Each structure stands twice: as structure tokens, then as C-alpha cells.
Amino acid sequence: MAHEWNGNTRRQFRAFSRGPWLLFGILTLLITTGCQTNPYTGRWQLMMMPMSQEVQMSAQAYADVKSDPKMKPSTDPREIEPVKRVAARVIEAAKRSKYSEMANQFEWEVTVIKDDKTMNAFALPGGKIAVYTGIFPVAKTEAGLAAVMGHEVVHALARHGGERMSQNTLAQTTLQAIGIALGVSGANPVLSQAGMAALGVGAQVGVLLPFSRKHESEADYVGVLLAADAGYDPREAIQLWQRMGELSGGKSSSEFMSTHPSHETRIQQLEEWMGEAMPIYQSKPPAPNHELPPLH
């Protein structure tokens, strides 16, 4: 029995001694395939997907949304004109920003979706933007809408979607490599499965969720700078999230288990960024700031 145990121990040791080198080789290969630095925050970003593929996938997703019979485009000029007006200003600000090269390459397109029950907007790599009319009551004004659109445009320009896909690929590959090492080591299968499950949860909570929150904060930060450069009062972003908090009844899910920062965290961060955003806004001619139309 002792001899068998020692043999298993030696096999496990050899497997795990190879494991770190296996992981190191995989991580090195994946990481060196592509990376970039965020021009605003200096944050290093893993990018394993070419931009052309992101744009192609986004174009297909945008076409699917537009062709969905449930997603009817608005035909009301009162809804379309303010969205197009704000989008034009935010896009021009993006073309002057540190993302100027990408922003000028995008083929921008804006669609207003008549869906009064959905508080949403999105921007995809390649410049495809959709705004749901359900966001109007919480945005309230064109400046509030600029805060929303600035945030979404930054997600596209910063390639947050591509980065998340890269992070998922890296996490899955790492877990697979660990699984192989556990299997080769002759470890107890039940314990191995439990360990892999725990590692999966750890990757989600410890790596992927914080990165998602970081993406949201990054989009809030750069988005408010774009809105200010477009001539919109950046303080509207604070009021926007205060209204979001009121609509949620003051309740927000645990930030630890959420892909988004809490409303309180967002408001606090936005207040801190006003020292940078307000001088930009004050140096620009003010943009029109009409109230958005009521839902009907």
C-alpha cells in the first residue's frame, strides 16, 4: 500500500511539475497573439480576435436586430431627430478623441427602435448604434442621452466585447490545461471534478466579473469625456444614474457577483471625474439640450 501510494505521489508530482510549464506555454502563446493598451487609462488589454472579425460579427448581429419583427424601427421624427442629433455630436467627438483612427474608420449607422418597455442602447464595433425609446424617460434630456450614447460608443471603440471573448478563451484554455494535468496525475476523479468546478467559479468571480466591471467603469469614464467634448453637460451622467437607482427601488445586486458596478459606485466615480470633464465641457460651445419626447 505504501509503495502504491508513493508511486501515485511520484506520478502526481511529475504531472504537476510539468503543469506550470504547460500553462506557461499556453498563456505565453495566447497573450502574445495580440494585445493593446487603452489610450485613456493605460490598461493592458488581451486581444486575440482580429478587429475585422469583430466588425463582421457585429454587422450580422445588427442586421439580425433590424430584421427581428419585434424590433420595429421608430418612424416618429420626434424620437428619431434628437437621437440622430446627439449621435452625430458624440461621433464627431469620438473622431477627435484618442480613438480617432478607429472612429474615423467605422461606418456609423444609427437606428431608433420603438420599444417603450426596454431601457437600452448599444453600439457595436464598426459603428452600428441602436437606441430603444424605453431609455427616454430615464435619460430625460439630450445631455442625458449623450451620457448613454457616449458610454456605449466607448464599449465599441475600446473593443470591450472582443476583450471579453479573449478573456473567456484564455480562462477556458487554462482550465482545460489544469484538467489535463489533474487527469495525467491520477488524482481522484471526484476531487478533480470538484476542484475544476471551484476553479471555474473562481475564474468567473475573481477574473471575468471584475473585468466586466472594469469595462463598465472605463466606458463611464471615457464616455463622459466624449459627451463633454460634444458640448453636453457631463453632470447629466450623475443625474442619469441617480434616476437609474430610483427606478431600481434603491436596490442593486451585490457588486461582487455582478458584471456592472453598483449605482452608488458609478455615481461616486462620475463625481470624481467631473474635475476632468467639466473643463472640457466649458471649453466647448454648448449643444442643444432639449427634453426627450414622452412615450406614447
Enumerate the predicted regions with their spans:
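A Zn2+-metalloprotease active-site environment signal
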Residues: A2-G7, F13, S17-L23, L27-H296
